[in-house]
Amino acid sequence: DVQLTVPSILMALLVDGLARGLISREMHDEMAIYVLIFAIGISEWPQFARVSRAATLVEKNKDYVSASTIIGVSNIVIMFKHILPNIMRPVLVIGTIGLALAILAESTLSFLGVGVPPTTPSLGTLIRLGNDFLFSGEWWITFFPAIFLVILAFSCLLYTSDAADDVRS
C-alpha cells in the first residue's frame, strides 16, 4: 500500500538519479531505456499484485473450485484450468492501462530531459525540441508528436476495452 502512494514519475526520477550517480555517463546513456523501464515497472507492479490477488481470492471461494477440490482435482490443475483463465480479464485490463500510463510516463520524463538521452528517439524528446519553435510559427514540430502520443495512449485504452470483451466471450 505504501508503494502505491509513490507516483511512477517520482519513482522513475529517483531510480534514474541513483543510476546516474552509480554508473558512468556513457554507460547510463547506453542503459537509460532499461533503467527507465525498470523504474516504471517497479512503480506499477503493486497494482498488478493487488488486482491478481483480489481476483484469485474471489475465484478461489467459488463453488466450482470447491467442487473440483472435493472430487480430487490437484491444486495445480485447479490453478491453471479454473482460476487463471478467470482472472485474466482484470489483469489484462490493468496491463493495457499500465502500458498507456508507462508510455505517458516515458514521454513525460523525456520531455523533462530526464529519461532517455537526446540522441535516442522519443516522443517526449520530440515535443520538447519542438517546444522551442512553438511560438515562432513552426507549430507542427510539437503538434504532430503530441497528437501521435495522444492517439497511441488512446489506442491502448481502446484495446483495453476490446481485449476485455474478447476474454469475456
What are these regions (language model features)?
Residues 1-161, 169:
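Alpha-helical transmembrane segments of integral membrane proteins
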